[in-house]
Amino acid sequence: MAITLISHPNCYRHLAGDDHPEQPARLSAINDQLIRSGMEFIVQQRDATPASKEDIYRAHSNLYVDEIYAKAPASGYIWLDPDTQMMQHSLDAALHAAGAGINAVDLVLEQANQQAFCSVRPPGHHATRDQAMGFCIFNNIAIAALHAIEQHSLERVAIVDFDVHHGNGTEDIFAGDERILFCSSFQFPLYPNTGDVTQADNIENLPLPALCKPAVWREQILAHWLPRLQAFKPQLILVSAGFDGHREDDMAQFLLTEDDYQWIAQQLKQLADKHCQGRIVAMLEGGYALSALGRSVVAFLKGLM
């Protein structure tokens, strides 16, 4: 068993504004906690290579991708939506974030008992096929999934999203695609206020109320996600790993702790060991309380071991 952490310096260079919660300090907090916990000596670390435009086209419309490239500013900021900005380094950061997922898929499919965690930003799961949303420019997890299907000939890829916000972009891209099983747990109502109605048979949404306690969250996952995942028999498990459901994170009102993120990693590891030779790729989504984020990522990685 080996865990590889994939990142890139360019992911630190994307800036969304001084008072924006999606900051480079998020990646620093993860690195600091890896050092503090001694995990830096256990995980293998490597730099991501950027995704190509052709890679991005798999998940997004050509028109949208071309528009993002054309809009990328040489200086200053532009707004893609009320929450999502681009500056001169944002396109490179987004390409390296998406590229990390592609690199991770290639890595874990080369040999069994491999897991990878992509410590990248900007996040991706709110980006729809043709729209930037919620801090997200390109949908990193969708790009990784389609790379696995089209370049590695996989037929069944599971995407598990435990960010406290619904992965509306991933659902938009994959609703009705029987090659994908998408499972998303999230607080509802809460931005983006979607997911309460199931759009397709390959979607398993778990809308849960504010102040959701860990025991309830775990019970719902055991009752709804795991039976679907077992029946699907995935050849690869991808994880949109958002840690903003932590009780210390003020972006929402869940009551989870780092122990819950270790638990979900253990559940996914058992599933992966049974169906896909332990192959798991996780990509960072949300998580904005810096200390809680670092602790939660380390706990999640320990759960994969």
What does each of the following model-derived ranges do?
Residues 1-160, 165-305:
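HDAC/HDAC-like amidohydrolase catalytic core signature
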